Amino acid sequence: MENKFLTPKTVFIGGSGKTKRIGIGGHEPITIQTMWKEEIVNIYEDDVALNDLLNRIDNLQKLGCSILRFAVPDVKSALSLVKIAEHTSMPLVADIHFDYKLALECLKGNVAAIRINPGNIGSRDKVEAVVNACKEKGAAIRIGVNSGSLPKDLAQLVEQGKMTRAKALSETAIREVSVFNELNFDQVVVSMKASSVQETIDANETFASMYDIPLHVGVTEAGPLITGVVKSTLAFSKLINEGIGSTISVSLSSTPENEVITGREILHECGKRTGGVTIVSCPRCGRVGFDVHGFVDRWQNELLSLDKNITVAVMGCVVNGPGEGKHADIGIAGAGSKAIIFKKGEIEHHFETTTEAAQWLIDNKITKMTNRTIVRQEITSRI
C-alpha cells in the first residue's frame, strides 16, 4: 500500500564552533531530544555550576540524547545558554516565548536552533527579525504549536465544537509555515503537541499528508513517569510506524535522563535504534535473594551510557538467572542468601553474599567499562 504521508526533507542544525552538525528528516536516524528541567540564569557567571551542568549534558549524550532544549525567559538565561554552547558538542535549542529579543541574544553564540510559538512572539516584524538572524547564523527554527496556545479564532471554534483540537493544531502549524515560506526560510521543523494521544496522532498525520517538513513528535504535559511513558509509547509507536516523526521528545514529570531512556527504548522497540546496552531484570517475588530494584535503580544510567552492544541480566533468584537470563552477556542473580555471576547462562563466580557479588560486578565490569574518571577529566578541562 502506498504511503500517504510525505517523506520529510532534511533540515540541519548545529555545525558551528564545537557543535555537532545533525540532520533531522530525510533518511537521517530519528533523534532524541529532551528539555533541561532547571533555570540556568546564573550559569554564565558560575563556573562550578557550569561544570556540573556540562557533566549532566555528557551523561545525557551517552544515554542517547542528540539535542537539548533550554527555557530562556530572560537575558541572563540567554547569556548562560550562549556560554553553555561554547563548551559542549551537543546542539542546543533556545525555547523562546513572548520576547523575540531573547532569540536574537541567543543567536549571538553557537545556539543551534530557536523554538518559537509564533502566536505569542508578537507581530510579524518580530518573527521576521528572528528569521533574518537565523539566516545569518545558519540556525534552524522549530515552530512549536501546543493545544494550550491556539490562535483565538481556532480556539473559539474548538470550544464551540465546530473544529477538533487536532484540526486546530494542524491548521495553526499550516498558518505559521505559510509565514516562513513568505520569508523564504525553509530550515524549519514543526511540532504539534497535545496532552491527548489521539489528538497528537491526528494532528501529525494531517500535517504529514500535506507537507514534507520534518516533524518533532511529542505528547505535551504527558504526566508522571508511568502515565507519561504509556502516552508517549502509544503516540510514538503509531506515528513512527507510519513513517512520521524525524525527532522525538518525551515529556515526563521526571528527570531528563528518564525522558531520554524512554525515547531510546521506544525507538528500539520500533526497530529504529540498534545496539547499546539492554537491561533485562525480573519483577521480583517471594523467592528473591537479591535487591533487583535497588541495583537497577542505582546502575541503570551507567549501564545504558555504555557504547556496547550487550545484554545485562539482573535476576532475583536462580529460577530466572541464569536459566531465563541465559541469553545475557553478563548477569547477576540471587541464590538464597548467596549470589552468582553468570555469562551466557554459565555460572562464572559464586559469592557468599549478594553485596559481594554486586560489588564485584560493579568493580570488574561496570566501573571499568564506563571510564568515569576519564570522563570527569575531559569535562573539567573544558572550562
Which ranges hold each PLM region?
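N-terminal amphipathic alpha-helix/helix-capping segment at the start of soluble metabolic enzymes
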Residues: 1-35, 39-42, 301
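Active-site mouth loops of central-metabolism enzymes
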Residues: 27-52, 71-73, 90-98, 154-170, ...
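Conserved, mostly hydrophobic/aromatic
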Residues: 32, 95, 143, 190, ...
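Glycine-rich, proline-tolerant flexible connector loops at the mouths of alpha/beta enzymes
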Residues: 35-48, 59-85, 115-123, 188-197
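N-terminal active-site wall of soluble small-molecule enzyme domains
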Residues: 54-60, 69-109
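Alpha-helix-loop-beta-strand connector modules within alpha/beta enzyme cores
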Residues: 75-96, 129-141, 204-215, 299-303
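Hydrophobic or amphipathic alpha-helical targeting/insertion segments
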Residues: 101-142
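Catalytic alpha/beta core domains of metabolic enzymes, predominantly
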Residues: 142, 146, 154-305, 311-314
